[in-house]
Amino acid sequence: MNGILNILKPPGMTSHDVVSVVRKKLNMKKVGHTGTLDPNAAGVLPICIGQATKISQFLLDGKKKYRAELTLGIETNTEDIDGEILRQREVTSSPDEIREAVLSFIGEYKQIPPMYSAIKIKGKKLYELARQGVEIERAERTVTIYHIEIIEIFKEKVIFDVLCSKGTYIRTLCKDIGEVLGCGGVMSFLLRTASSDFSLDTAITIEELQALENVEDILLPMDYPLQHMSKAIVKSAYSKQVLNGNRIYSNYLIDTIHEPIGQEVCVYLEKEFVGFGIVRNEDHNQKYIKILRLLFEKE
């Protein structure tokens, strides 16, 4: 079984908990998620099954969309409402000032990841160090906030939708907004509404998954989130060359290579998605596709 499940992770479960449920349901070991959601957050969590685990990096690289609630006037050690309160301050900013501060983060900005995160430094996850009372210096990361829509501002609460790049911590965004306003802030609610091409309206709950007799009925194809990529469709006569990882020349293809040098493409054998390649150029200016990753072994 190979494909992707769009799971609605409930609050109270870790992303790995969801993977464990799917493994048990399918009686398969080759199962993985595509981007950690905080245990207390809910939302879209694509789960890769079988050979689809080999494309998880492409899903990790995709944009994410969230609905979040920011509570101003509080600072905690975890940057969310569940952490130990470090400081409380009065919120004196007007709704217009709050709106301006929130929207000022649209674009690229440098974030310092929270200590309570799964990032590894020298082989140790930061949250493991944080639980031991150890805090270490973290390097800034450039993240991109593509869009923010403010849904409501009510006293110290701000509800907003945000579209952002991979690796963006919404907890840290909330903390940073609070710092700009001079009163501190924490994330008090988080729902991931989209991850790459997977959205909330097509996600299934754990309960719905457990009730299914045939999971393959809802399994999405491996290339479902890759529709934005160009396709290189290889003629069946050249299947051996592809599965051996050899170069793919234009005459191997149903159509010629139109893509520019350096562009990654999805490689198909007729209708079957078999891997990824990148367009390269030989010394005599003949384009070819170099195989980057095969999803299936040669039989």
Swiss-Prot record:
Reactions listed under catalytic activity: uridine(55) in tRNA = pseudouridine(55) in tRNA
PANTHER family named among the record's database cross-references: PSEUDOURIDYLATE SYNTHASE TRUB1, TRNA-PSEUDOURIDINE SYNTHASE
Function as written in the Swiss-Prot or TrEMBL entry: Responsible for synthesis of pseudouridine from uracil-55 in the psi GC loop of transfer RNAs.
GO BP annotations listed: mRNA pseudouridine synthesis; tRNA pseudouridine synthesis
GO terms, molecular function: RNA binding; tRNA pseudouridine(55) synthase activity
EC number: 5.4.99.25
Active site: 38
Keyword Isomerase: yes
Alphabetic keyword roster: Isomerase, tRNA processing
Keyword tRNA processing: yes
Taxonomic path: Bacteria, Bacillati, Bacillota, Clostridia, Peptostreptococcales
Superkingdom of origin: Bacteria
Assigned protein family: Belongs to the pseudouridine synthase TruB family. Type 1 subfamily.
CDD domains xref list: PseudoU_synth_EcTruB
Protein name per Swiss-Prot or TrEMBL: tRNA pseudouridine synthase B
